[in-house]
Amino acid sequence: VKRYIDVMAIHKLNTLHWHLTDEPGWRIEIKRYPELTAVGSRRGHTTDESRCLYPCYDGGYDPDAATVSNGYYSREDFIGLLRYAAERHIRVIPEIESPGHARAAIVSMKARYNKYKDTDVEKAAEYLLSEPEDTSRYASVQYYTDNVINVAMPSTYRFMEKVIQELAAMYREAGVPLATVHLGGAEVARGVWLGSPKCQALMKEKGMTKPHDLAEHFITQMADIMQRNGLKFSGWQEVALGHTEEAHRQLRTQAAGVYCWNTVPGYDEVVYQIANNGYPVILCNVGNFYMDMAYNGHPDERGLDWGGYVDESVSFSMLPFSIYRSLRTDGAGNPVDLDAAEKGKTVLTAEGRKNILGVQGQLFAETIRSFNGVEYLLFPKIMGLAERGWNAYPAWEELRGAQEQQAFNKALALY
């Protein structure tokens, strides 16, 4: 991590968004919940996940082995890394995934429940994130069927607040300011909560009519918890979509950043719609800035391809204020008619333009097994990210046709 922070500093990248939790692991020590690391940071052979998570990805069969499947950052590690980053003028934003992508936390708190249920039922259920009676049937994009926190249980909010408070305490000890915690919010599968008695009771009590109302309930509750602790919330684009106007009025004032990632054709208008709606936006365009996308379609290339292929020219071509013209080829590699790309699309308003805070690159680690893999997928792609972060108005943006192509080619050659 220190090597990566050094690389960021060299390229004048000023914010590290640290994805500390997800399905396959919980990677930060929280003293109040030792199960999060005793269970949630380890993967191996198990029949009940009482001492570790099931194996996934490469290896992960021995929960005690020193592999990429196992391990976490201790409290002392994290505090030291916060200071190291601050010395290099880099802000660290921690992410605690919720309510989806939360399987490691859910399994860990279930293990805690099972540890105490025969001796102290109240203590066992104090921080439980799942409802034993929930019969909901769903599958996430990654094919998990039990990765979403139950948003109707008071124990969920107790758990989240204590985690946030411990994170804030680490920042205080490090002498580093904390303004926001990223709450995730992405990719909650359809079908969640439909078989949960507690969720159905909450819907009836609050007059809710659709499952999304529960997601709205969660993010507004969490925004209030964050505010109570002197923080603003951040989240992926889903945290700002589909809400009532009442919820939008609340969330606009409590949001530090909405991270817009899904810019594949058909969804790319969402970015400017969110900015025009008054939310602060960070541009995370999958087609330009997902560093875990493969460089190309060669079978030996490591990386994913669901969002297209990303190389240094693709990251360089991103236009923050003309996102529809940010991809110069389609998924099949055919040239895009850039002059027609914006027709009929949502226009970024003057007020919306003020809400574009910056750009961010993502590197998810499903296909990575070592730091060499990190370096391979980041370089030289990351240079395009840095260029666009510091030069949001490249010379070719206002040009069209052959002039635009010539200006782009010249800038790319110099870059």
Question: How should these model regions be labeled?
Answer:
Residues 24-87, 102-152, 191-210:
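Aromatic- and acidic-residue-enriched carbohydrate-binding clefts of CAZyme catalytic domains
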Residues 20-24, 32, 96-102, 155, ...:
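Active-site-proximal loop/turn and secondary-structure-junction residues that shape catalytic pockets
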Residues 1-23:
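A conserved hydrophobic secondary-structure block that centers on an alpha-helix together
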Residues 4, 81, 92, 222, ...:
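Aromatic/hydrophobic pocket-lining residues that form π-stacking "cages" and hydrophobic walls in ligand
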Residues 154-161, 165-181, 201-415:
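Substrate-binding groove of N-acetylhexosamine-processing glycoside hydrolases
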